[in-house]
Amino acid sequence: NSLIKASYFSKKTNLVCLSDDSGLEIDILNGKPGIYSSRWGGKRNNFNLAIKKVFKSIEKVKKNRLTSNKARFICCLTVFWPNGQSYSATGILNGKLSNKKKGNKGFGYDPIFIPKGYKKTFGEMDPSFKIRIDHRHKAYNKIRKFFI
């Protein structure tokens, strides 16, 4: 998806383009919502609705399987040049889901995602700290050589 977006806008503007595609993968849901993470919030990307859908989907699956709250955020960044050259980098942040929303910082699924090695959700963390450990930061560290 990030390649499609970067290619489209680079060709349309004849400029170098950087595109991001990120998503939350939940093990018990076989990687869903994944690249459709924002779509789980409906037409208006309502993440309160998306989070409710996550919890409802997990409850349905729990009845039939051993439970796991493992999850990961994945970000793919793509740089695309007007000459057709491109470079993509992926950042992955493993963690787990909280059993309820915690915190009001950040956006999207931040109130239910706890990064591995931490006890707080992204929604409870100071945004200036979160951005130094998240999946986008990991992807950017791999791609930043094109911007220095």
Predicted feature locations:
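Anionic-ligand binding patches
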Residues: 1-148
